[in-house]
Amino acid sequence: MDEFHXYGKEDSSWQQCFLYPLFFQEDLYAIYHDHYLDGSSSSESMEHLSSNDQFSFLTVKRLIGQIRQQNNSIVFFLNCDPNPLVDRNKSFYYESVLEGLTLVLEVPFSIRSKYSVEGMNEWKSFRSIHSIFPFLEDKFPHSNYILDTRIPYSIHPEILVRTFRRWIRDAPSLHPLRSVLYKYRNSPDNLQRSIIIAPRVNTRFLLFLWNHYVYGCESILVPLLKQSFHPRSSSHGSFPDRTHFDRKIKHIIRNSRRNSLKSIWSLKDPRIHYVRYAERSIIAIKGTHLLVKKCRYHLPIFRQFYFHLWSEPYRVCSHQLSKNCSSSLGYFLRVRMKPLLVRTKMLDELFITDLITDEFDPIVPIVPIIGLLAREKLCDISGRPISKLYWTSLTDDDILDRFDRIWKNIFHYYSGSLDRDGLYRIKYILSLSCAKTLACKHKSTIRVVRKELGPELFKKYFSKEREFDFPAFSSKAAARSQRERIWHSDIPQINPLANSWQKIQDLK
């Protein structure tokens, strides 16, 4: 693999034209075989090992050779023996073929994405979730409209094959991909007759298809939007001081109406920012309402003509940040006006000036979170705490750890909101539900539980000091958190509660 990467750097045409021989390299399937044995620790994998002690690479090669045959039911095992052990072995070889196909196709894709990231003027994709919230905090106050779009996930298999043909010239390597996609499309379980890819799937093959599909869409869409919204203008470069710039230009070229209109249009300086997480993408726009309507109209047309995807108009929603909120990433996103008092001293006089600035203010959806906690049997619909009867068989430390873990995850994810009164309401619900669970386990009351365990035990698990991971500066961090938002860097993904609430919002 390392040698192949080296050859790809020296000659980019070689890595695009000679992919098919890599399907017959045993090392690729050995990588997946070792990964499968090391990564799976379930009882199902142990049963599989007992029924299949030896892994034959020759069998994998024969399966690869049969992929290009017309009757490939032997490979994809749609008409296979009903014996469960045989089915498990065949499905294991089928997964091995898919993993080998994925490993081969990932090599040129990884090289291309690496070069695009290293480029100075290239658009950088595939950032982590840690950079999304600071990006929104930095760019949203300078925008007045947002477009909330959903990327279609039901795709015809031939569209995926054509996207690979744009940068892979090796036609034989695309035949196995086409066979796999069409076989999955025509399977009896697939009623929609299309490939359904999503960012939350478990298989590596579908994850790779999703990443490649999104990369192909964004690599064309984002530079095109930036080029349209950032035209080159000579008016801005020749004036380093832009104070009252609009007024100066109007005064200088008042006689020439045509030039004045051009200059005023360039001074509006429309901007666009793009961010995506999973299948939801947000386009923040600084411009007029007419410009937003044009973008909302042209986005489905762009996807239809470039990628042959029919995107329904209702999938693109526009919101004005100063009036409406947009639900995304488990937050209600909005921009509010923040007044500031600025003291200016000139000679012996002191002036106080009121300034109004826009501030990114995400809102915590308290009512939906309470509804999701009620679904988990931690409270009722009105937010009244109840005992978790399913956890009464655990030890006291395990019960406290589970409730504390739920609170810590919720607080860390929603710590970016300055209005935390609702969060402390969630904390009260969880702490009281924990006390009721312990009281139900010991067959006593909440007062007796608090008296026996002591208030220090609840302070240890539900204290404000544990909300911050700054042992040397815990007091300073707690004081600073009351007036500043802190985005915690230990968030690996979107919160499960926020994810569930977002799915409910999408259904609405």
Swiss-Prot record:
Disulfide bonds: none annotated. Usually encoded in the trnK tRNA gene intron. Probably assists in splicing its own and other chloroplast group II introns. Belongs to the intron maturase 2 family. MatK subfamily. This is Maturase K. PANTHER family: MATURASE K. InterPro entries: Domain_X (IPR024937), Maturase_MatK (IPR002866), Maturase_MatK_N (IPR024942). Its main location: plastid. Keywords: Chloroplast, mRNA processing, Plastid, RNA-binding, tRNA processing.
